[in-house]
Regions:
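Short N-terminal segments immediately surrounding and downstream of signal-peptide cleavage
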Residues: 20-35
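Amphipathic N-proximal alpha-helical interface segments
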Residues: 19-22, 45-111, 115, 124-162
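Sec-dependent N-terminal signal peptides
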Residues: 3-16
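Hydrophobic pocket/interface hotspot
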Residues: 38, 116
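Long, hydrophobic N-terminal alpha-helical segment
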Residues: 35-37, 44
């Protein structure tokens, strides 16, 4: 079967807004600040995903923006807490799409991991796993992550969708 899409994703997320993780930004946006600093409520709801996430009993949803003016990513997905009128960012991920070019995705992943490792002065954990949303079991995630003391993390991933 032909491989359809390769996706590079850098995810920054935290369980509790900690000092370590909040220094990182994707396309100028930080965890812990309001998404209203960048987008209107109308734009947030227009781009809202139908999926919701239940992380430690707080319901979250995501909203995704595609902007040709982004410097590093083709799309940014932001996770917000349901019923939060301040629209505080709890997790943010940037994506680059590599159609039928998994090796290019892996090169970009390695480049970012090396930069992050030098900056963070810590090691990362890597592995491959089947993507949970592909019922065929043929799609693979190439995942690496840095785990902080407060259980927040930075993940760098390539998805190979089948």
């Amino acid at each position: 079967m032909k491989k359809i899409l390769f996706l590079f994703i850098l995810t920054i997320s935290c369980n509790v807004l900690g000092e370590d993780i909040s220094d990182f930004k994707i396309e100028g946006m930080y965890i812990g600040e309001s998404l209203l600093d960048y987008y209107s409520e109308e734009e947030i709801f227009k781009n809202k995903s139908n999926a919701s996430y239940n992380l430690k009993e707080a319901k979250f949803y995501s909203t995704t923006f595609r902007n040709s003016n982004f410097e590093n990513y083709e799309a940014v997905e932001i996770f917000l807490k349901s019923n939060d009128n301040n629209y505080i960012i709890y997790s943010i991920r940037g994506g680059i799409f590599y159609e039928n070019k998994i090796e290019e995705c892996k090169v970009k992943k390695k480049e970012i991991l090396n930069e992050m490792k030098n900056f963070l002065k810590m090691n990362f954990v890597s592995g491959e796993l089947k993507h949970q949303f592909d019922e065929t079991g043929k799609s693979i995630q190439y995942q690496s992550y840095f785990l902080f003391e407060d259980n927040s993390n930075i993940r760098v991933e390539c998805y190979q969708w089948s």
